[in-house]
Amino acid sequence: MLPRSALARSLQLQRGVAARFYSEGSTGTPRGSGSEDSFVKRERATEDFFVRQREKEQLRHLKEQLEKQRKKIDSLENKIDSMTK
């Protein structure tokens, strides 16, 4: 069984926002906090781009679902209105 703190952290990460994890460099070894070479910058930019594209896709999908639900609600309201007349 997981401790409460671990369970709470796992539940927080399961929300709709993707957590961003960056690689430390080409060799996988930890680097100093101040060293940023071109590979790390390029990799971070690529990962950021991928995350933004994924979030755009999710947002588009949610908007489509919302539009379908709005149409369904409008249809049901029209049906109710026609029955009450």
Swiss-Prot record:
Residues 1-22 form a transit peptide. Disulfide bonds: none annotated. GO terms for cellular component: mitochondrion. The keyword Coiled coil applies. Keywords: Coiled coil, Mitochondrion, Transit peptide. Pfam families: IATP (PF04568). This is F(1)-ATPase inhibitor IF(1), mitochondrial. The lineage of its organism: Eukaryota, Fungi, Dikarya, Ascomycota, Saccharomycotina.
